[in-house]
Amino acid sequence: MAADESSADTLRLQFKAMQELQHRRLQKQMEKKREKELSCQSKADNQEGFMVIPDGLSLLDTEEQNLKNIFEKRVLEDEIQHLRSELRETVDENGRLYKLLKERDFEIKHLKKKIEEDRFAFTGASGMAGDLVATKIVELSKKNRGLMAESESAKVRIKQLTNRIQELEHQLQMASAKPPSKGATDAGAKPLKTQTGDRALLETPEVKALQDRLAATNLKMSDLRNQIQSAKQELRVAQKVLANEVGEDVNIQQLLASPGTWRGRAQQILVLQSRVRDLEKQLGQRQNKPAGSSSSEVPLSSDSRKMTAQEKNLLRIRSLERDKQESWEKLASERDTLQTELEELRKKFEGMRSRNKVLSSEVKTLRSQMTTLVEKGRHDDELIDALMDQLKQLQDILSSLSVQEESRRTSQQHLDQKVNSEAQRSSSLVAQLRAMVADREAKVRQLELEIGQLSVQYLHGKGGGEGASPADARFPEDQTPITNSPASAGDHVGRLGSSRSVTSLGHTLVESALTRPSLPSPHGTSPRFSDSPEQKGWQAQAAEMKALWQAAEVERDRLNEFVTVLQKRVEESSSKLLEAERRLQEERQRAVLLEQHLEKMRLEPSRASVSQKTKNKPGPPAANTKPNSAGSAKKDSSSTQLCDMPMESQIQELNARLAIQMEENGILRDALGSALRGKEEDFRMYHQTLGQVKGVFLQALRQQKANKQ
């Protein structure tokens, strides 16, 4: 129905557009006609003026006639325009009504198709379904009747409008055929036309109100006419139905005046039909009677007549019984067929109901799956968007890190260049300082030699003044170098040590070596760089770096120890695991051997044969347990002990060992199950944490999107 409405709307719009185009064309044609008429009138006026002047010698009469002619022309033009506008309106209304008729016909066809489809769909339905179908059919028939009535009224209105159009066209033709000037016979009509023209020219609110009322009354009249036409059509239909029911040439007033009976016309028709059948049967029986019955005796004529009446009654009764029997048989067969059809329909209905249930359940499951898939797709889309955002962020971070790495590399290259330049400078400075130190040491040696010489001279001069002996003078002369030699040697050693410290620790300690006094001279050198703030700052930084380095070394040692301890623990646990696996294998092999031995002990008939077999037996287990020599030795010893024991004790021992092995196996299974359960719990917790993290992540993303929006 939505498609029909949309198509109807499009058709209406197209129809409106066509009407507008036609209206514009008509306006253009009317304007052209007006221009032509005005030009023709102007020419005719000029000719009449030229022609009237010589006939009528008075100019006033000619002017009055011209004015009257002009006024009449104007009135006629107004009437023509009014008639043309009415004609145009009626044409437009006629087109609209034709369009509405087409739409109604289309709706009627659509409804008929729908009714047929409903009939085909609900054929064979019984019970409530049949009632629903009947009610629906009744409603549709009512709607169809209403639409048919509307279509009939529209057709009647179209006929009226076509008649009106024809009348208006006729009036228009008559008005155009009228002469422009009239004689003295139309002298009485001229004042009326002038009055109508004056009224038309005057546009007052009262006139407008009256025109509106006139239009409303015209609309009401058209509606009433349509209703009257529809009522007339219904009356005609009713009369046709009565004529078909009662018969033609029957006075309805007499039927209304005559008292009615309880029997209707249909019942009377049935009674008459039954009487006709009876009469036909009687006629057939009379024709089939033998000719000998006519030659019967006269005295028995009354009895034969009586018998014929009885026979007639009997025949009639028998025929009625036959008819009843046939009708009963027909009804029974119809009932059977209807019952079979009803059973089939019930089966079909049950099948369809079960099918509908199955399909509804499938539809529900599919809808739930669709909803879950839609939710999953939405979550996946959100996750993909989040991952894409994260990927973009990581790409941005990677690009920034690459830029930082490039900048760090460039800065590292600059630092390396600076360090190399500083190292070259420091090496050149160290070489210069070494040269200076060597020069100063040479100067110091020269000064020491000069001081020694001066001291010797001083001692000589002092000895000469006091009158000392040359031996005494020699003694101190010899003594002074001896006494001074250790000092000079010590000073030399100190200088060597200072030079070594300079060479080993760089130019920072050269200054301290230079400021340190090399010998006990009377004028000592003052320290210049021993207490400088720069040196103190470098020393403090060096101490801090040293402390940090020591702490890092201690931490590294601790971590190494921790790693070694962990490695030891891992190795111990792995060794324990291997040992446990080896023991488990040994115990399994031992249990297998014990079971085999027990079976053989049960099968052996005597103790001697058992001992012989056990003596010959130890070969295969040793071959089976080649990888574990200790296990094979234990098994051999246990087997020899079992061989020495009696049968009952051997069986008890084997049962005890088997029970122990079963307990150990159960314990190992329990341990394995607990380990598996622990792993499963860990895996479950891992999945739960992942789900929680995913949920939190999605919630945060949704909040972020909501905040952005």
Swiss-Prot record:
Transmembrane segments: none
Disulfide bridge map: none
Taxonomic superkingdom: Eukaryota
GO CC term, one of those recorded: cytoplasm
Record-level GO BP terms: cytoplasmic microtubule organization; DNA damage response; non-motile cilium assembly
Annotated signal sequence range: none
UniProt keywords, alphabetically: Cell projection, Cilium biogenesis/degradation, Coiled coil, Cytoplasm, Cytoskeleton, Phosphoprotein
Positions with biased composition (Low complexity): 293-302
Residues annotated with Phosphoserine modification: 258, 469, 532
Subunit structure: Interacts with PCM1, CEP290 and PCNT.
Name the record gives this protein: Coiled-coil domain-containing protein 13
Source organism per UniProt: Mus musculus
